[in-house]
Curated annotation (Swiss-Prot):
Biological source species: Atrax robustus
Expression sites by tissue: Expressed by the venom gland.
Molecular function in Gene Ontology: calcium channel regulator activity; sodium channel inhibitor activity; toxin activity
The name this protein goes by in its record: Omega-hexatoxin-Hr2b
Leader sequence residues: 1-22
Amino acid sequence: MKFSKLSLTLALILTQVLFVLCGKINEDFMKHGLESQALHDEIRKPIDSENPDTERLLDCLLDNRVCSSDKDCCGMTPSCTMGLCVPSVGGLVGGILG
């Protein structure tokens, strides 16, 4: 197969552009890791905001299994029952849990 000088030059230029682009992405990754600035700001929001997201809710509940009042249960739907943060569940399970 014969390649013209122009096609080889274009292939070389495109390869260099690809390497530069990958280098910039890698440099940004080395500085910030997997977190973008927007994600970092979201993580820093207070837990007791009006509409807490699911991840923060789960993190709070898993960290605060033992409680002395409802406030220890992140101030959300779960309540402190017998020293444990228990979600408000209806039906048979809710009756058993209190």
